[in-house]
Amino acid sequence: MEPSFIQSAMALGLPSKKASSRNIAVERKNLLTVCRFSVKTLLEKYTAEPIDDSSEEFVNFAAILEHILSHRFKGHVSWFSTDGQRGFWDYIRIACSKVTNNCISSIENMENISSARAKGRAWIRLALMEKRLSEYIVTALRDTRTTRRFYDDGAILLREESSVLTGMLIGLSAIDFSFCLKGEGIDGKTPAVIDYTPYLKFTQSYDYLSEEDDRESVGGSSSEDSSPEHPYLPLLTDEESWYSKWRKMEQKFRIVYAQKGYLEELVRLRETQLKNLEAENKRLTQRISEQAEQSLQEKHQLEGVILELQEQLTGLLPSETAPIKQFTPSLGAPLVNQWPSLSTLNDNEAPVNPSLYRRHSFLSTEHLSAELSLSSESQRLDGKQDGEPWGPIGKDPTPSMLGLCGSLASIPSCKSLPSLKSNECLVSNSSETSPTGSPS
């Protein structure tokens, strides 16, 4: 039972899908055909006066366009919608936001229009007054991601027929529309209904009548000239046929002429924009060239400043070594006879070794302290070998400390501490006595 039931359900499901796809295709075809007829009717009706809401042709066209924009729309409940039901205005508001100088914000700020349906109808009227309805729809169709988010498969806006729709709407740019959006004329509660009767025309062909109907119509006539041979068929003469052809040609000419005027106006607008852009491009190019020249001049100036600073720097470097050379010979005299004698430090000390007073050249004070420490160590070892202490018991008067203290204590003149860091240290080997004071 179960496999047969599943097979029967699948068999019933296939025709239902085919029927639904056929219905969707028929809806698309009907809406596009009626829209084409409606646009032609508006172009024929328009003379010199603008079209407003009182025109029955416009009311029908607005209803048709609303049905096209709502075809296969995902009209689920939305939290962001004021009336709880989404309409095509939610799609237009997002997809047409990229249009330059759009009217989306103007419609959103209208106080007397609150529902999404009323805002969508106001947008249709405002776009027609701006003569930009085709531009809005073309921009919306380019945003395929947003279009697929708002419409189901099979919608007119997701099919190739959408390009046919935009081509139809171009001709409406040649018509002047005038609407009042501040009043209560825009109704957002009742749905729009399309009137198909102006576009229905039935012509019965001669082959449709059977021979029996033909005999009955002929036999039932009471008089020969009371009715024609086929009362249900209009007798078209040559003059009427030519007149109908002329009317069709006139309609086509009006449509083409309206489109031609719109395209010429569009070309003039684009030419004006192109001229403005060319002027702007020329101005920016000139500005760039001026800035390049200015930057080149600044670069040359900076290079000259750098060269001048380098010349000044090279001129200052030799003058820095000259004071050092002048300062070196002046170090000998003040330090002579300022070193304390070792004999005054200890009465039991051996005679002074003249080899201690030697002339040395040191690169820094560190070398001086190292040399003096080595000499003190050698003297200490010599003193221990002889068995005689050369200094006071309990103290370690090294020559480095003694020499430093003596020099600092006995020079009241203008010889400061940096003089000790010079390149030479002069020691006299004369036999003059040291200063009176000796360290205790």
Curated annotation (Swiss-Prot):
Q: Which residues form a coiled coil?
A: 262-317
Mind telling me which Pfam families this protein's record contains?
RUN
Sorted UniProt keywords = Coiled coil
Residues covered by region (Disordered): 213-233, 374-402
Q: Which domain of life is it from?
A: Eukaryota
Tell me where the signal peptide lies. none
- SUPFAM superfamilies membership: RUN domain-like (SSF140741)
SMART domains associated with the record: RUN
Q: Where is the RUN domain?
A: 52-184
The UniProt family comment states: Belongs to the RUNDC3 family.
Output this protein's name: RUN domain-containing protein 3A
- Whose protein is this, by species? Xenopus tropicalis (Western clawed frog)
